[in-house]
Amino acid sequence: MKAPQIKTQLPGPKAQAIIERDRRVTAPAYGRVYPLVVKQAKGMEVEDVDGNLFLDFMAGIAVASTGHAHPRVVRAIEEQTKKFLHICGSDYYYEPMVELAEKLARLVPGDGAKKVFFTNSGAESVEAAIKLARYYTKRQHIIAFDGAFHGRTLGALSLTASRASHRAHFGPLIPDVHHVPYGFCYRCPYQLKHDSCGIECVRIIEKQLFRYEVQPEEVAAIFVEPIQGEGGYIVPPPEYLPMLQELCRKHGILLVLDEIQSGFGRTGKMFACEHWGIEPDIVCAAKGIASGMPLGAMIARAEISTWPPSAHGSTFGGNPVACAAALATIELLEQGLVENAAKVGSVLKERLSALQSRYPAIGDVRGLGLMIGVDFASTDGHRAPERNLRDRIMLKSFEKGLLLLSCGESTLRFCPPLIVGPSEVETAVRLFDQAIEQTLRE
């Protein structure tokens, strides 16, 4: 591994020129976090246009699961491009789509047959799940969670509640969506303790929501991330998801799991819900499914997938090249990368927790597998989020050649490609340590 190697001031002259061109022609809606202008990437390394090499611990927001340009994924893409690039799976048939659907139906937890609808992204998978849940149940209402991120298309945005700015001036959003607190023990909204709270964040649904706002017989689905992603890499208490599943089954409500960021080996299991033995009615997937090719999927129990032909569609969803990439990706995941995520993720979490003992500003280190968050908080005992400190440390890490991304109010996420090894972990933690120390001294 050559990275990191920083040869120029960041951004370098070539990067500055491209950034200036970008400002003139691209929409300002893009929320770029630091001035990285990529030339090429391989494995764990990203090279910018000025020849600087970075160690990648963000994987394009947990997308490059097999590393950048894995040769087996590239070969699968090349072989499919020689056959055909596009036909439209909504109107015709091709084997890569069928083979991938068969594989996804096998991988998603739960007994019985499943049906797959292919999309281009996570947000589209959520949109499809909203429609299917309402169609199947003939109910309108949906429950989602504070801190949730399900996408920014209008339907998905109605479920998203990780940042008010995401929703500002886009109303009215779709009606009959109710948000309740997520199971976030570190900053419990009820100021309770996990060992004595009775999991109030689930019980409140029946105690309050079903009593004052909506009857359970009107609720189509509960949409929940097994681990909140953009909300701050929040792992709920162990009783949380099983209690939600029990509540759904009690009232005939569909349990829809958003595994867009947590799925495909990221947490050391193929799907994060496996850590708690959950069997969802619908799973929304994307990101790590195809190593960077644009692909998403909604996988539902077959008895739920009752909508008729043309009830939903997608011109590009399930593109054959993307399906070929996904098949190669899943093969690599099953041949050791899921286990590697569990093994190396444990090392990474241990090393980051060691930093927590040295820096009081690190309030919490949490996560499963290679989905780990480091939360910066005030040191006065109130655990107030330290967003500014988090952002400064992220930028300092970038300047040292370590690529990280923020999430939540004050968290930095560590979500490297699943090919990461112990040596890359040691390098990343060393650079992160230096970034924290220098930032705190400034």
Identify the residue ranges that each predicted region occupies.
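Conserved N-terminal phosphate-binding loop of PLP-dependent enzymes in the Aspartate aminotransferase
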Residues: 1-442
